[in-house]
Amino acid sequence: MTGKSPFEALSVETLAVRLGSNEALCSHIGKDTSRWKVREVGDGNLNLVFIVEGATGAAVVKQALPYVRLVGDSWPLPLKRSFFEYHALTRQQARAPGSVPAIHHFDEGQALIIMEYLSPHIILRRALIEGRQLPNIARDIGLFMARTLFRGSDLHMATKDRKADLALFADNVELCDITENLVFSDPYFDAKMNRHTSP
């Protein structure tokens, strides 16, 4: 699969066929696609997320969709958000090594990121809902935030590098808009998209 192919969403059934020749993925899980076990584990609103296990390891394959996953194509979103996620992850890895999954491959045309599978890690939200005690969470999040925010700031970066970062991420309008509205604004008033406040 190359970035020049028309976008096509992956599925559990098509992933091995479409990514079986991807050297980055095969180098982490093995080339024999008949031994690949593919599970779709995405529990979010926006992306497809697969765990792919093979003879020699496992990886995560994440693909953006051109719409909000839980709503459908009536709420379109640009695929370029995977471009911003890829660049954010590479910067976070450089600024706070070991704090985010390693990136194995990025295909901009397919809005696809292949990354390290961090087992037995789980999504933080799940641990919090289950009431798990996480004694190091404040320290770990604090260190990650301090390292990435300071090392990505004017105080640490060369001016030309900082301006290049600002220019790169300035076009990430749609995903920022969703976060700002759906997470920080809409839950607190009778917003048009809120279903729980409708009769």
What are these regions (language model features)?
Residues 50-160:
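ATP-binding pocket architecture of kinase catalytic cores
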Residues 1-15, 116, 160-199:
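Active-site catalytic-loop/activation-segment of kinase and kinase-like phosphoryl-transfer enzymes
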Residues 1-38:
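Juxta-kinase regulatory segment immediately upstream of eukaryotic protein kinase catalytic domains
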Residues 31-54:
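ATP-binding glycine-rich phosphate-binding loop
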Residues 32-36, 76-83, 199:
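Glycine-rich, flexible loop segments associated with nucleotide phosphate handling
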Residues 44, 81-93, 171-183:
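A short, hydrophobic secondary-structure junction motif
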Residues 36, 101-102, 164:
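Residue-level recognition of the N-termini of beta-strands and the immediately preceding loop/turn
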Residues 23-25, 64-68, 150-157, 189-199:
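Short regulatory "switch" loops immediately downstream of catalytic or recognition motifs
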